[in-house]
């Protein structure tokens, strides 16, 4: 059935009103950037803080930090990255290279009327933020990154090849490589169940998926949500991924080896902006081989010479910004306030 344009616009307006009610009066708009239409959530006036989400997430992952930073005199800006939520999702896998994604954010920064912004990243958003700082440090005042430490380019081995050699084909990153396979596995499960399983995963062990058996291959398991996560939160994430599917997010992983090839000219480049890094001690990313030694024994500081603060939160999993929202907001504010 085709509905009149005026009806569709009215319904979109009502949806935005409902989103505003559930997320603390955050405003929503669309921006044309780098050839795509990007959805942006924002709140507040003052120096701009760009929040970059990960997988399987949305701008909504930063809902607490947006409200907190806006109340403290900052303009909090959180887009849905390309392929996620209400932002366009180009069909071509090649449209999700790190250069495309960083290009989107450079255009977004310029659309804000800012020469430089503070940047906060988590998960894939952290990877994007590291690369933004490598490619365009002139756009970043300071960076707060979470969960995923900087990964200097290995000049001799592609990243997916390295991970497959350690973990085999069942590591989630390896399992996501073949177009269509992960989509078929995810389609067998309820979307809300998938979101719950990802957000509540707190094992320091790597996330492994047997072929055809993502999270055991069944949605029958009853999951009790932690205090920091509500059914409304799950439903918001699930409603968006039910509309878009997960292909956009998978395509980030499918470009890992291609990003390695394209970024050869930046081999050995340091991250030269002020940095604070935060991670939970139960975060699987923190327990990847050699990561702890890299973070704590000089390698991280060598590659990120302006690393100022390193915070390891005890008893905290991967989704640190949602699990400890107030503490994380305080850490962000304290750090960026030094440079405001």
Explain the meaning of each model-derived region.
Residues 316-324, 329:
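Catalytic histidine-centered segment of alpha/beta-hydrolase-like enzymes
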Residues 36-88:
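Conserved HGGG/HGGXW glycine-rich cap/lid loop of the alpha/beta-hydrolase fold
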Residues 23-27, 37-38, 47-48, 72, ...:
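Flexible "cap/lid" subdomain of the alpha/beta-hydrolase fold that forms the substrate-access gate
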Residues 55, 59-62, 124, 130, ...:
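Signature tryptophan residues that serve as conserved aromatic anchors
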């Amino acid at each position: 059935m085709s509905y009149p344009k005026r009806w569709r616009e009215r319904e979109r307006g009502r949806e935005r009103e409902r989103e505003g009610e559930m997320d603390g009066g955050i405003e929503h708009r669309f921006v044309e950037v780098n050839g795509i239409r990007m959805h942006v959530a924002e709140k507040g006036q003052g120096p701009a803080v760009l929040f970059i989400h990960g997988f399987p997430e949305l701008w909504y992952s930063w809902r607490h930090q947006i409200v907190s930073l806006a109340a403290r005199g900052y303009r909090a800006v959180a887009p849905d990255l390309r392929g996620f939520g209400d932002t366009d999702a180009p069909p071509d896998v090649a449209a999700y290279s790190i250069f495309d994604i960083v290009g989107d954010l450079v255009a977004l920064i310029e659309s804000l009327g800012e020469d430089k912004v503070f940047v906060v990243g988590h998960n894939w958003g952290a990877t994007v933020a590291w690369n933004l700082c490598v490619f365009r440090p002139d756009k970043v005042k300071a960076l707060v990154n979470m969960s995923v430490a900087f990964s200097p380019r290995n000049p001799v081995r592609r990243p997916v090849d390295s991970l497959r050699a350690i973990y085999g084909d069942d590591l989630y990153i390896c399992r996501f490589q073949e177009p269509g396979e992960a989509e078929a596995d995810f389609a067998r499960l309820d979307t809300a169940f998938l979101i719950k399983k990802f957000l509540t995963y707190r094992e320091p062990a790597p996330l492994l998926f047997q072929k055809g058996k993502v999270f055991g291959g069944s949605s029958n398991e009853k999951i009790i949500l932690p205090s920091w996560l509500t059914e409304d939160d799950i439903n918001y994430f699930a409603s968006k991924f039910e509309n878009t599917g997960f292909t956009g997010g998978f395509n980030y992983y499918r470009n890992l080896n291609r990003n390695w090839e394209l970024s050869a000219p930046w081999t050995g480049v340091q991250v030269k902006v002020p940095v604070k890094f935060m991670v939970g001690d139960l975060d699987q990313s923190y327990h990847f081989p050699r990561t702890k030694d890299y973070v704590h024994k000089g390698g991280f500081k060598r590659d990120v010479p302006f690393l100022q603060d390193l915070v390891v939160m005890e008893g905290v999993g991967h989704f640190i910004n949602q699990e400890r929202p107030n503490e994380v907001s305080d850490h962000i504010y304290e750090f960026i306030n030094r440079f405001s």
